């Protein structure tokens, strides 16, 4: 599988952009600030439905525009399909396949699988739990068709439940005579949905971690040395899911115990939004004991493990994205990731300096030239729009004169 052409409209810093890729290694070279990371991020969003750089769609849309569009021509096994997503600054994101009917973006997540390697990957080990949850969400979205929809539904339910808890906490918007009972009744309904969706998400995440564990341990040992033992440990907030065959009743009792605390704080105190994934090295938490080099290697092994699992489960080689990673790595790790990249169907690499371009056959794209070409196209479009507007104005005046 590979992307042959990518087009962006109003995506971050790109007003309009069209570029062609080839199978194998593609390198986007240009100084910082030209927008090369935005290009490969657009591929990540098309693939996974989200970006590792932001939790909101708003930053993905060029300022002053209501939406951004990403279109990709994808070739796989001799067939070509066109995937298009429309990212709304506010509201639902939509998608089309081959110009067909509009559908939710979540419905095409994973159809163009990709795995990204970025400078922020070390935070998968050293960063906060939200970083690791985002990784789990992207991984599960690639591997489990229903996951993206379940996550979206859970996020909505969690917001509704939190809003009711806040009402109970500060009394805002509650009718003195009847309102509190109505809020409590609503809270009971939302809590039931919160538990049902939360249990499913927890099970899905646990299954994904189970798929990743063996290749992660094996790949880390091959990169760092056979004597090093790395492992993944799921730390779910709903730990009842791991302890009971029917965890919903136990979780419901847990909510009853913490109800006063939730009302006092006005927020959901347990649930998948508080899950974590611990990376362990030699039976110790890596974020506390591993060196920077060991953290980099663990993050690299985790992404390589995800690639291996997606390849095996989906029977397709994901597109590999290497975003500005070579400047961050020593020669040994550069070699390891290049050996991995050269075996893949398509690799998109961003580099700032020409000296960072890896040796070997590659399709190199000059991002500065692409930016200049894009600006010329924007100017042509603006001029044409002005001409059309002037023509309409003249036509209108002529009609008025005749009448």
Residue spans for each PLM region:
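Conserved lysine of the Walker
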Residues: 36
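Short polybasic amphipathic segments
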Residues: 6, 68-74, 91-98, 277-282, ...
């Amino acid at each position: 599988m590979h992307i042959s052409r990518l087009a962006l409209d109003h995506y971050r810093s790109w007003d309009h952009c069209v570029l062609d890729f080839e199978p194998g290694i593609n390198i986007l070279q240009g100084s910082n600030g030209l927008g090369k990371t935005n290009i490969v991020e657009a591929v990540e969003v098309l693939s996974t439905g989200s970006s590792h750089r932001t939790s909101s769609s708003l930053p993905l849309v060029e300022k002053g525009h209501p939406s951004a569009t990403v279109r990709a021509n994808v070739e796989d096994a001799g067939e070509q399909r066109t995937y298009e997503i429309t990212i709304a600054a506010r509201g639902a994101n939509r998608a089309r396949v081959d110009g067909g009917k509009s559908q939710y973006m979540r419905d095409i997540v994973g159809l163009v699988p990709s795995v990204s390697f970025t400078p922020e990957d070390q935070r998968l080990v050293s960063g906060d739990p939200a970083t690791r949850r985002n990784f789990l969400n992207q991984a599960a979205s690639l591997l489990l068709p229903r996951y993206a929809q379940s996550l979206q539904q859970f996020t909505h339910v969690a917001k509704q439940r939190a809003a009711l808890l806040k009402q109970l906490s500060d009394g805002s918007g509650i009718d003195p005579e009847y309102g509190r009972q109505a809020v409590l009744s609503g809270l009971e309904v939302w809590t039931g949905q919160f538990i049902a969706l939360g249990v499913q998400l927890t099970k899905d995440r646990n299954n994904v971690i189970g798929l990743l564990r063996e290749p992660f341990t094996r790949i880390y040992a091959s990169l760092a040395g056979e004597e090093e033992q790395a492992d993944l440990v799921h730390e779910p907030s709903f730990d009842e899911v791991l302890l009971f065959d029917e965890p919903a009743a136990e979780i419901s009792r847990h909510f009853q115990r913490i109800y006063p605390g939730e009302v006092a704080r006005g927020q959901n105190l347990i649930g998948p939004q508080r899950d974590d994934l611990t990376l362990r090295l030699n039976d110790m938490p890596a974020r506390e004991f591993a060196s920077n080099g060991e953290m980099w290697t663990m993050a690299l092994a985790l992404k390589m493990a995800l690639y291996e699992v997606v390849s095996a489960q989906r029977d397709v080689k994901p597109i590999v994205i290497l975003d500005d990673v070579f400047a961050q790595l020593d020669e040994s790790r550069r070699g390891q990731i290049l050996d991995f990249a050269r075996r893949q169907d398509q690799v998109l690499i961003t580099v700032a300096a020409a000296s960072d371009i890896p040796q070997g056959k590659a399709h190199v794209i000059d991002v500065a030239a692409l930016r200049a070409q894009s600006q010329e196209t924007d100017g042509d479009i603006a001029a044409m729009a002005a001409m059309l507007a002037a023509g309409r104005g003249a036509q209108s005046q002529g009609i008025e004169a005749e009448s």
